[in-house]
């Protein structure tokens, strides 16, 4: 975590449980990020928190630190049964749930509190086996959580701490009824510590906080630009015919160490993957159609650096904690203004710099005015020379289901192509 991203406030300055402080310092966390410095005084005093912060600013560690401290400082209810977790974290996607679980593991190891995962699409029996052994903290997506609850594999009657992460995304994905169903199975709001975190605190998110929390304190950490001042933004206006060639030319020019390319549909993502894989790039595909085990494998390969490029739909736009993403390409301008912010927020995280390149084609250029109004500034426009676009491109690979595979390893040096001045 970059020092420029941190405050002078140290975790050791708070009256945190010693085991929590020890675990944080062992992982190299000494100073708080702004959202952590704002949230911890409130949660340590037992106050509910609804927090807004740009992605990559330490929201996850803010609620995990608060949760572990609370559970260590407050006894579990008497005669708690093995199927009753003490804390629940709800996440909108499987990937985010898995990432939160990974972030929580060092704290769990240091404190002895047990973790459980519950997400759909994979591992029903494996997850259930862990739950049946008893967990203190359950992390999951709403559909699988409800499934286990209806089967009496879990009972939420002993919940002492609850976290709703990426609350705005929960609304976008249509999970609000599931969330309310789960809340109704918990003790009343004034008998638990409640935390909600979101990239935006819209009216509907605040309404949810009012319904399900106990007089929550609202905290916000937002840069002057919604997109973050460390992200260089750039916009091109290609024709539909030149769009793919422009993307491939830009990739050859930029030769990014680690890039994510976003498109608006899974079919467009598959098309992009086919072109890049055929051209020798180490590229992975992440859409809703990709099987869970392969999704996790692809994310792991991308995080390790075995893949240079990830092509993704907005299912992957939030909650991905991938370090050192250097470039984000918006192959399609998103229909939702907030998705633009979340997409390019994959780069320039935790104080690092990043580069976002957007293609405003004939089909999606109409989304640009609303995006620029939302972010509060115009995206700088760059020109390109159509005659300098790559032409020596191989025939794209076709995706054979259920394969989601990776392209061949990137070889050689980037080809030299120049933009117009």
Curated annotation (Swiss-Prot):
Q: Does the keyword Cytoplasm apply?
A: yes
UniProt keywords, alphabetically: ATP-binding, Cytoplasm, Helicase, Hydrolase, Nucleotide-binding, RNA-binding
EC number per UniProt = 3.6.4.13
Protein name as it appears in the record: ATP-dependent RNA helicase RhlB
Into which EC class is this enzyme placed?
hydrolase
UniProt biased composition (Low complexity): 402-414
One cellular component term (GO) for this entry is: cytosol
The segments labelled Disordered in the record are 392-421
- Where's the motif Q motif? 9-37
Where the record annotates domain Helicase C-terminal, the positions are 245-390
**To which species is this protein native?**
Shigella dysenteriae serotype 1 (strain Sd197)
On subunit structure and binding partners, the annotation says: Component of the RNA degradosome, which is a multiprotein complex involved in RNA processing and mRNA degradation.
Molecular-function annotations in GO: ATP binding; ATP hydrolysis activity; RNA binding; RNA helicase activity
Q: Which family does it belong to?
A: Belongs to the DEAD box helicase family. RhlB subfamily.
């Amino acid at each position: 975590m970059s020092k420029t991203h941190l405050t002078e406030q140290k975790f050791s300055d708070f009256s945190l449980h010693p085991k929590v402080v020890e675990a944080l310092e062992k992982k190299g966390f000494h100073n708080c990020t702004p959202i952590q410095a704002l949230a911890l005084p409130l949660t340590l005093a037992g106050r509910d928190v609804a927090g807004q912060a740009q992605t990559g600013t330490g929201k996850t560690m803010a609620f995990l630190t608060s949760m572990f401290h609370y559970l260590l400082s407050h006894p579990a209810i008497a005669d708690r049964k093995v199927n009753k977790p003490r804390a629940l974290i709800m996440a909108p996607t499987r990937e985010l749930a898995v990432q939160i679980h990974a972030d929580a593991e060092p704290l769990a190891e240091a404190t002895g509190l047990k973790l459980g995962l519950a997400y759909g699409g994979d591992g029903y029996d494996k997850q259930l086996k862990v739950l049946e052994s008893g967990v203190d903290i359950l992390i999951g997506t709403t559909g699988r959580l409800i499934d286990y609850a209806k089967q009496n594999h879990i009972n939420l009657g002993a919940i002492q701490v609850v976290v709703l992460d990426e609350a705005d995304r929960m609304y976008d994905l249509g999970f609000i009824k599931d969330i309310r169903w789960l809340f109704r199975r918990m003790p009343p709001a004034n008998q638990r510590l409640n935390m909600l975190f979101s990239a935006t605190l819209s009216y509907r998110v605040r309404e949810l906080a009012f319904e399900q929390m106990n007089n929550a304190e609202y905290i916000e950490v937002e840069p002057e630009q919604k997109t973050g001042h460390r992200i260089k933004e750039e916009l091109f206006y290609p024709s539909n015919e030149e769009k793919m060639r422009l993307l491939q030319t830009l990739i050859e020019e930029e030769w990014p160490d680690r890039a994510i390319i976003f498109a608006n549909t899974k079919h467009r993502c598959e098309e992009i993957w086919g072109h890049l894989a055929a051209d020798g790039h180490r590229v992975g595909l992440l859409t809703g159609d990709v099987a869970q085990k392969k999704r996790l494998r692809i994310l792991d390969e991308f995080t390790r650096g075995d893949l240079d490029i990830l092509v993704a739909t907005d299912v992957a736009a939030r909650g991905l904690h991938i370090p050192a993403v250097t470039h984000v390409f918006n192959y399609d301008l998103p229909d939702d203004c907030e998705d633009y912010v979340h997409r390019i927020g994959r780069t320039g995280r935790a104080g690092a710099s990043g580069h976002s390149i957007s293609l405003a084609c004939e089909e999606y250029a109409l989304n640009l005015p609303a995006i620029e109004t939302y972010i509060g500034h115009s995206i700088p426009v760059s020109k390109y020379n159509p005659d300098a676009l790559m032409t020596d491109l191989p025939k794209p690979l076709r995706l054979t289901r259920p394969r989601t595979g990776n392209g061949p390893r990137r070889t050689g040096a980037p080809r030299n192509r120049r933009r117009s001045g």
